A protein has these predicted regions:
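Hydrophobic alpha-helical transmembrane segments
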Residues: 1-30, 35-170
Length: 170
């Protein structure tokens, strides 16, 4: 959820706000291609790599904005820790093979005092990955609700900012 805040919501809204519906649709098409075939396998190596690299370029700014929005949301959300969100965001935002994936994860992990990511299985193969955040406590089901609230608040902040910009330019 923390990673998908950027590519699932923040980035599409930014692309629609700047480039209109065509921009939002273009962004989602590239993002979906990356999700579906962006893996480096023999069948889709050239097309998949192109989709993955284009997705990296398109998400470069939105991922960083998402990390900042999630951090700001952590300052506003009762029970979340904005100071720790900022600390972990700055420390761990580059702990991922993708240049963009860890920004939101780091802010969310810090806000909720969680450790996210780590080793993962893909197509039956274990991939060693770094952890994001500190292992302050066990993850509990309520953390899903807290992460959702953090995401919704970050999205709400973005909407307010975009509406203020829209009102100012009209």
């Amino acid at each position: 959820m923390a990673e998908n805040t950027s590519d699932g919501v923040i980035a599409p809204f930014l692309f629609m706000a700047i480039f209109g519906p065509v921009g939002g649709t273009f962004y989602k098409a590239v993002n979906t291609m990356d999700s579906m075939i962006g893996y480096t396998n023999d069948k889709y190596i050239l097309f998949g790599r192109t989709a993955a690299k284009l997705d990296d370029v398109l998400n470069f700014i939105p991922a960083r904005i998402s990390g900042c929005l999630l951090t700001l949301a952590a300052y506003l959300l009762p029970g979340a820790d904005g100071k720790n969100a900022w600390r972990i965001f700055l420390r761990d935002r580059r702990k991922h093979a993708s240049p963009n994936s860890a920004h939101g994860e780091a802010a969310c992990a810090g806000a909720l005092h969680l450790r996210l990511a780590g080793d993962a299985w893909y197509f039956g193969v274990l991939h060693k990955k770094q952890f994001i955040g500190d292992n302050d406590r066990e993850i509990v089901p309520e953390d899903i609700w807290k992460a959702s609230l953090l995401m919704f608040l970050a999205e709400g902040i973005l909407m307010v900012v975009l509406l203020m910009i829209l009102a100012a330019v009209r």
